[in-house]
């Protein structure tokens, strides 16, 4: 296959929105991280719910992970 015959790859996300996605995703992730921390500090061992802990931590890690991904893309580290 010739190089000229191949179509150029275009990103599904416009690079102009990388900064906005970074800030929004990291802010949401920090909110859920803070919520998880406050929940852990203020609850006793009798009032803790493992499913709530797992859900909050999963959501926080997903938002923080994608936020860091777009941060890396924003600064030019293409992963």
From Swiss-Prot:
It comes from the Eukaryota. Ubiquitously expressed. It is a multi-pass membrane protein. Keywords: Acetylation, Cytoplasm, Endoplasmic reticulum, Membrane, Transmembrane, Transmembrane helix. One of its GO terms (biological process) is inflammatory response. The chain crosses the membrane at residues 17-37, 55-75. The keyword Cytoplasm applies. GO terms for cellular component: cytoplasm; endoplasmic reticulum; endoplasmic reticulum membrane; membrane; oligosaccharyltransferase complex; oligosaccharyltransferase complex A; oligosaccharyltransferase complex B. GO terms for molecular function: oligosaccharyltransferase complex binding. The modification N-acetylmethionine is found at residue 1. It is found in: Membrane; Endoplasmic reticulum; Cytoplasm. Pathway: Protein modification; protein glycosylation. Its main location: membrane. Belongs to the OST5 family. Component of the oligosaccharyltransferase (OST) complex. OST exists in two different complex forms which contain common core subunits RPN1, RPN2, OST48, OST4, DAD1 and TMEM258, either STT3A or STT3B as catalytic subunits, and form-specific accessory subunits. STT3A complex assembly occurs through the formation of 3 subcomplexes. Subcomplex 1 contains RPN1 and TMEM258, subcomplex 2 contains the STT3A-specific subunits STT3A, DC2/OSTC, and KCP2 as well as the core subunit OST4, and subcomplex 3 contains RPN2, DAD1, and OST48. Subunit of the oligosaccharyl transferase (OST) complex that catalyzes the initial transfer of a defined glycan (Glc(3)Man(9)GlcNAc(2) in eukaryotes) from the lipid carrier dolichol-pyrophosphate to an asparagine residue within an Asn-X-Ser/Thr consensus motif in nascent polypeptide chains, the first step in protein N-glycosylation. N-glycosylation occurs cotranslationally and the complex associates with the Sec61 complex at the channel-forming translocon complex that mediates protein translocation across the endoplasmic reticulum (ER). All subunits are required for a maximal enzyme activity. This is Dolichyl-diphosphooligosaccharide--protein glycosyltransferase subunit TMEM258. It comes from Homo sapiens (Human). The gene is TMEM258.
């Amino acid at each position: 296959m010739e190089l000229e015959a191949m179509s150029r790859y275009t990103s599904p996300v416009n690079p102009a929105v990388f900064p906005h996605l970074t800030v929004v995703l990291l802010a949401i992730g920090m909110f859920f991280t803070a919520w998880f921390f406050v929940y852990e500090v203020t609850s006793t061992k009798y009032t803790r719910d493992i499913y709530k802990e797992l859900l909050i931590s999963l959501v926080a890690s997903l938002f923080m992970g994608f936020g860091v991904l777009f941060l890396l893309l924003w600064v030019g580290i293409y992963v």
